[in-house]
């Protein structure tokens, strides 16, 4: 799912996600761990109480939001 992301990048390439927008108003997220592979940078975020994976694709420099398999709501 395409998503708009407001973030900053550190000198080491790490991302700090501030908020995301999915066709509605901007929503603040809590950020977890992140990693990079040959295809993308991956960042775990908490959105509406559910953990999602934000993916910045290296080939298009676009963000995608993915639900994690077996993802559950946190209370």
What are these regions, as identified by a protein language model?
Residues 1-75:
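Cysteine-centric segments in proteins
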């Amino acid at each position: 799912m395409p998503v708009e992301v407001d973030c900053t990048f550190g000198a080491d390439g790490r991302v700090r996600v501030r908020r995301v927008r999915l066709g509605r108003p901007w929503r603040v997220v809590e950020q977890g761990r992140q990693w990079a592979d040959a295809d993308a940078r991956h960042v775990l975020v908490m959105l509406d109480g559910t953990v999602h994976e934000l993916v910045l694709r290296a080939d298009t420099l676009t963000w995608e939001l993915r639900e994690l398999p077996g993802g559950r709501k946190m209370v």
